[in-house]
Amino acid sequence: MKNVLNTDLIYEVLSVVEEIPEGRVATYGQIARLTGRDRNARLIGKILSMSAYYGQYPCHRVVNHAGRTAPGFLAQKELLLAAGIEFRPNGCVDLKKYRWDC
């Protein structure tokens, strides 16, 4: 049951997120693939939305497939800008330039 939200899965996802280097971003889909859940990018988003309950993780480094930040995570863009990540005029991260090469 790979789609079951359990503590092991949560920490597996968060351990991958911890590996994203400063100055880089990953997509929900990348994290899903790296955890063996290729078709579960939304599940990754759900886990990251609850990450504060599990400690300090750099979840601000995860964006959607187009480079958009998470709605409702108002500090995300500021944190990325502080790390030197630039945004295109459309408000998205330039994934060709800043995507984590994992």
Predicted regions located by residue number:
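Nucleic acid-binding interface residues in structured DNA/RNA-binding domains
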Residues: 2-102
